[in-house]
Design a protein with these regions (language model features):
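Alpha-helical transmembrane segments within multi-pass membrane transporters and channels
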Residues: 58-103, 109, 243-248, 278-279
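Transmembrane helix-bundle core of multi-pass membrane transporters
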Residues: 86-87, 91-162, 189, 254, ...
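Cytosolic-side transmembrane-helix boundaries in multi-pass membrane proteins
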Residues: 82, 113, 174-181, 185-188, ...
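Helix-loop-helix "hairpin" substructures at the membrane interface of multi-pass membrane proteins
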Residues: 14, 137-214, 238-244
Length: 286
């Protein structure tokens, strides 16, 4: 029983990381109907900003987290203004080709600037180590990541469902012409939404370094996981992304722990079963 609880805790922590990496794509894809396969490139931007800030500039780890968010958000706004907004009415294939091209560019830039070796980071002493609760070993850093992910989930639900900005997003998505007629700056709203989603990816990338490491293939490797979470959770659903991330994170960790020879396939098996049951996702609309 104790090993199972430990696996459950580690799986939940991994699920929270997947949630941070994927929820921004769920928002932009579900609400703006834009297929952004470059989403994990923004996560990689946040991660390498954290690496540079801590190792080169000597900035404390916690102080780099908002920097990672801002860096990814700023780059995304520039790309949204210059490139992405021109493709909002394009076909899904055109959007995929554009954004996957950006992934290749980001990988090449990172390889040129940082090389292809695995990067690591040293977190503060107070985030290292672990402690036992009822015989279950809990890593302090994992608890820290879980706390941040839960705060982000609550803030997103409240922000999108209960605030004026959230109402503007929903109005702009439902009917752009009507929203413009009501005085809503749709272009600005979309840019801010894109910045929010990409900034969260940057934050997730910064937090991912300690758990899963970082190299120039990060944007491709975790794009698959992010797309799985968004598909299983349902487009545009924050609650769906949260539930899917937890379920898939626990499944992935448990599969690799109990059946390491087949562990890498568990997350795909769970995805197939869930999408056969609910093709629109757990919280998606038909």
């Amino acid at each position: 029983m104790i090993p199972f609880l430990g696996v459950l805790f580690d799986g939940f922590a991994y699920g929270m990381l997947l949630f941070l990496l994927s929820v921004g794509l769920s928002v932009t894809l579900g609400m703006m109907n834009f297929v952004n396969l470059a989403h994990c490139s923004f996560a990689m931007i946040g991660a390498y900003v954290t690496i540079t800030a801590t190792q080169t500039l000597g900035i404390p780890f916690l102080a780099t987290l908002p920097l990672a968010f801002l860096a990814a958000a700023i780059v995304s706004v520039v790309l949204e203004r210059v490139l992405f907004q021109r493709f909002y009415r394009a076909t899904d294939l055109d959007q995929c080709l554009l954004t996957i091209g950006i992934v290749f560019v980001s990988i090449a830039v990172v390889a040129y600037l940082y090389g292809t070796t695995l990067q690591s980071i040293k977190v503060p002493a107070y985030l290292q180590g672990s402690f036992n609760v009822g015989g279950v070993t809990m890593g302090i850093y994992r608890l820290f990541l879980i706390a941040i992910a839960l705060d982000v989930a609550v803030a997103l639900v409240v922000g999108i469902e209960k605030t004026r900005f959230g109402a503007r997003i929903r109005a702009a998505v439902d009917n752009q012409r009507m929203a413009r007629g009501l005085g809503i700056d749709v272009d600005r709203t979309f840019a801010l939404t894109f910045a929010l989603g990409s900034g969260l990816a940057g934050l997730g990338g910064a937090l991912a370094i300690q758990m899963v490491g970082l190299d120039n293939d990060f944007a491709f490797r975790y794009l698959i996981y992010v797309l799985i979470v968004v598909s299983v959770g349902g487009l545009g659903s924050i609650g769906g992304s949260f539930a899917a991330a937890v379920l898939l994170g626990v499944s992935d960790v448990a599969g690799k722990y109990y059946a390491p020879q087949f562990g890498a396939f568990f997350i795909y098996a769970v995805m197939i079963v869930l999408l056969m049951w609910r093709p629109q996702g757990l919280f998606g609309r038909r």
